[in-house]
Amino acid sequence: MSSELKSMHMGQVTSFFIPNVTLVGQHCSKEIPNRLKALGGKHPLVVTDKGIVACGILKQITDILDEAKVAYTVFDGAVPNPTDKNVEDATKVYLDNKCDSLISIGGGSSHDCAKGVGFVAGNGGRIQDYEGVDKSNKPFPPYVAVNTTAGTGSEMTRFCIITDTARKVKMAIIDWRCTPSVAIDDPVLMMGMPPSLTAATGMDALTHAVEAYVSTAATPMTDACAEKAMEYINRYLRRAVADGSDKEAREGMCYAEYLAGMAFNNAS
């Protein structure tokens, strides 16, 4: 072990947070019912946004749930930069329909909204009560996060960003309990992303990797993830932008953004 490593990390306790299970690969979303049942979920609230509904991705997932005879309720009101009111509305739907688990479908907004529901439904109170670090004290409902963009890494992080409309600020909630139980990164769900969104989300992943790599909280594990993420982004992002139907490039970006998420999630 190098003297540099000893000076940086020896004698320190570091942590590494990731979902219990992660599935990456073409059509892995077909495993959602099995994974949900394994967690004990019988009636999930499906949290998504109008864009995911309009492009047909929600139907792809609900068809899978229907085929497996899984009862569910849909909340499609997630908005960009989800608000406390957004979380309140979704939580009411969750409780009114006696849901017992969560499935989020989309990018960061859908995942953050679902995480907000998990906090309030599982612990009570208001979402504002959980601003800060590890403020919850009860387990989250079983939670499957289905990613549709190769960018934020929200499907696997312990971060939840919710806008407080009264204070007009974004609340940063960092809590290991909101890490999804299962993360799904199915490149087939990303084939329809336009070039502009593919590029923007890819740069988001690159930013996460670079920030993690230069962080003072970086560890050998986060460095390894960040380095591989940057390598894959360099290899696959331009291909995915040029041809959205390039399955190898889409799958490569799934790995890239997940690796970047692992780095960022644990070096912040």
Annotate each language-model stretch with its function.
Residues 20, 122-220:
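A glycine/threonine-rich phosphate-anchoring loop and its flanking beta-alpha core
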Residues 45-46, 101-103, 144:
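Conserved beta-strand elements of the Class I
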Residues 212-268:
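Active-site segments that bind and position negatively charged phosphate/pyrophosphate groups
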Residues 41-43, 99, 141, 180:
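Local beta-strand N-terminus motif with an aromatic residue
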